[in-house]
From Swiss-Prot:
This is tRNA 5-methylaminomethyl-2-thiouridine biosynthesis bifunctional protein MnmC. The keyword RNA-binding does not apply. The gene is mnmC. It comes from the Bacteria. Catalyzes the last two steps in the biosynthesis of 5-methylaminomethyl-2-thiouridine (mnm(5)s(2)U) at the wobble position (U34) in tRNA. Catalyzes the FAD-dependent demodification of cmnm(5)s(2)U34 to nm(5)s(2)U34, followed by the transfer of a methyl group from S-adenosyl-L-methionine to nm(5)s(2)U34, to form mnm(5)s(2)U34.
Length: 672
């Protein structure tokens, strides 16, 4: 994976940004905003189409994000539409854009000063504008009414990675970028064909250029194109539409993802941070959600800790783990910051510092640093810099995550559910233990059985952590269970100076000023799957710190002898990635893929899955860093919205991936 380089800008005599790489302006010197409105909104008939649009979400694709002017302009127009048409079917705008050389945040802010009327929207974008990390960044705005998927990287690499189903995902294309004469590499038949693959039937397209090869290329890709009057003094531009689309999907048949059919009600089984984030994402999409939780209140399971570290799980090879956790961590930051505007919960973006405490950890972290991640995401610190960063003496180098920190998952989860409980389309049923799920073929509904009674729902999500084996449908999913104990230690004058979450062969949080305790942990115990206090784990948590930091007196001040602690059971996967998506029918999959290695690609059947049954499981010890994006992914899938990760990364999260990998190698999967 190539690293992302920021755009190199100059500013011409009228204050318009000019690309040094392409020697071209980002927008018209005369009136860039009016040009956007004319070329992309008017010629794509957007105002008229919104009036009669018959789906909940309208999706726009754009080939060059640049300054974000097109996005801000269409967002402004959409807000006007919503105010004027509160009862319209269309409720949500989704904007998917690509950018090889993203502007730095400072340059973006400067560019936006040209349009005071967009200042309020621009400020919202600035707040969540991502660092230069490759692939898709999902930014959810206006309580879910507006979504921006910003893909960072060369569009020739990104476009083939965008997942889509048989119907396509794009309702309108903004074919924008630097002029074809300035950036010939982008304007080619592969681009036009890629746009066509993502387009829905009746998808419209417009572009400022009138170049003949662009018009012919779009026609070859399947669009009906024509020349129209250009903006201002420009004589011509081109616009058109895709009249019909051939059904096709980018998902491999054995990693197929389907949305829920005939969706009118959804049951979520769980009560942790993943369930809360999922319920929020679904309710924002207008869905009716009922939560079933066996406990008296939320966050009684693995999400119940006082303080949890939030930072990405990265590696230098940029494998699936790194490609999931980099955007997931950044999405968690966004999710938490937005939640904090309305809710109260303990958290602090104080940074996370990972010590190079021995040769093995040093080699591992150096290998991670070889991945050339953006400095906003990760930095190497000398021993002196580490001491300054954490606020305590230390004689070790480290890796620092400046955007990381800690939060109280119990408080966040409970606050999210309390907020949801004020809404008409959310119901929480606590102390309701779901015993069985039965699919009623006649009504095409799931029966959710609890203590001698049942209710019916069109879709069900299993998000109950380590208790996933309660249900026959998920009993064979290859996930493990690990007990963890976190110790709570009282503040001392010295320990109160810790300014960053500290990671080593364990972790320690800064003192929470609201309770004058810090957290240190956490144990890993696969043998004793209970939630009883473990005196050995309590001692082990303290000893890990003194073993990794043997030469500092402050490490010995951590006092766990009061036996203050919390225990929970993690739901973990072998490959450290969650299981998110459709629940596979294990027995049927074994039969249908019994001879998978010898089956021709075109003859492979779509994987057998239970109808309208989904799971969000296996978040392990990094659930705080992954749950919000995994929930957003699943809500998007259930509701047939664009998905926020590359298609090959989605395969790494597929709930049936372990079975499929074995079957593709011709191995038996009696158990995993």
């Amino acid at each position: 994976m190539t690293s992302i380089t920021h755009a190199e800008l100059g500013w011409n005599e009228v204050g318009t940004p000019v690309s040094d790489q392409f020697d071209d302006v980002y927008f018209s010197n005369v009136n860039g905003l009016e040009e956007t409105r004319y070329v992309f909104l008017k010629q794509n008939l957007i105002p008229e189409r919104w009036q009669e649009f018959d789906r909940r979400r309208f999706v726009i694709g754009e080939t060059g994000f640049g300054t974000g002017l097109n996005f801000l302009a269409v967002w402004q127009a959409f807000n006007d539409f919503r105010r004027a048409n509160p009862d319209a079917t269309l409720k949500e705008l989704h904007f998917i854009s690509f950018e090889k050389f993203p502007l730095s945040k400072q340059d973006l802010i400067k560019a936006h000063q040209a349009w005071p009327e967009l200042a309020e929207l621009a400020e919202k974008l600035h707040r969540h504008y991502p660092p230069a990390v490759p692939e898709c960044h999902r930014i959810v705005l206006d309580n879910g009414a507006v979504t921006l998927d910003l893909w960072l990287g060369d569009i020739k690499d990104c476009l083939p990675s965008v997942p889509y189903g048989e119907e396509g995902i794009i309702d309108t294309w903004f074919l924008d970028g630097f002029a074809p004469s300035k950036n010939p590499e982008m304007w080619n038949q592969d681009l036009f064909n890629g746009m066509a693959k993502l387009a829905r039937s009746e998808c419209r397209v417009a572009t400022f250029t009138s170049a003949g090869f662009v018009r012919r290329g779009l026609i070859e890709a399947g669009f009906a194109m024509k020349k129209v009057k250009g903006f201002g003094t420009k004589r011509e531009m081109i616009a058109g539409c895709m009249e019909t689309r051939q059904p096709q999907s980018r998902h491999a048949p054995y990693f197929n993802r389907t949305s829920a059919s005939h969706l009118d009600s959804i049951a979520i089984i769980g009560g942790g941070i993943a369930s809360a984030a999922l319920a929020k994402a679904l309710v924002q999409r207008g869905q009716k959600v009922t939560l079933y939780c066996k406990h008296a209140q939320a966050a009684e399971g693995a999400s119940g800790n006082r303080q949890g570290a939030v930072y990405p799980l990265l590696n230098g090879s940029h494998d699936g783990v790194s490609r999931v956790f980099a955007p997931a961590f950044l999405f968690t930051r966004q999710f938490v910051e937005q939640a904090a505007q309305a809710l109260t919960f303990d958290h602090d973006w104080c940074g996370v510092t990972q010590l190079m405490w021995d040769e093995k950890s040093t080699n591992k972290l150096d290998k991670m640093l070889s991945g050339n991640f953006a400095p906003e995401l990760i930095q190497k610190l000398s021993a002196e810099e580490t001491a300054a960063k954490i606020g305590l003496p230390i004689d070790m180098a480290s890796v620092h995550y400046p955007l990381g920190g800690w939060l109280c998952p119990a408080e966040l989860t409970q606050a999210l559910f309390a907020q949801l409980d004020t809404l008409d389309n959310f119901t929480a049923k606590f102390e309701q233990s779901v015993e069985q799920l039965i699919w009623d073929e006649r009504s095409q509904q799931w029966q959710v059985h609890t203590q001698g009674q049942h209710d019916t729902y069109s879709a069900v999500v299993i998000a109950n952590g380590h208790e996933f084996q309660t249900f026959s449908q998920t009993a064979d999913i290859p996930l493990g269970q690990v007990k963890g104990q976190v110790s709570h230690a009282p503040a001392t004058e010295t320990l109160s100076k810790l300014k960053s979450v500290l990671c080593y062969d364990g972790y320690m949080t800064p003192v929470n000023p609201n309770n004058q305790h810090l957290c240190i942990g956490a144990s890993y115990d696969r043998r004793h799957l209970d939630t009883e206090f473990d005196v050995n784990a309590q001692q082990e948590n303290a000893e890990k710190l003194t073993q990794c930091v043997p030469n500092q007196a402050w490490a010995k001040e951590v006092d766990t002898s009061g036996n203050l602690s919390r225990q929970g059971i993690r739901c973990v996967s072998r490959d450290h990635l969650p299981f998110v998506g459709n629940v596979g029918d294990f027995s049927a999959i074994k039969r249908q893929y019994a001879d998978l290695p010898h089956t021709q690609a075109e003859e492979i059947e779509v994987i057998s899955q239970f109808p309208n049954l989904f799971c969000l499981l296996g978040l392990g010890s990094r659930g705080l860093s992954s749950a919000p994006l995994m929930a957003e992914l699943l809500a998007s899938q259930i509701c047939n919205d664009p998905l926020p990760l590359p298609v090959d990364v989605l395969e790494e999260l597929h709930p049936s991936r372990m079975w499929v990998r074995k079957l593709r190698k011709g191995k038996a999967i009696t158990e995993l």
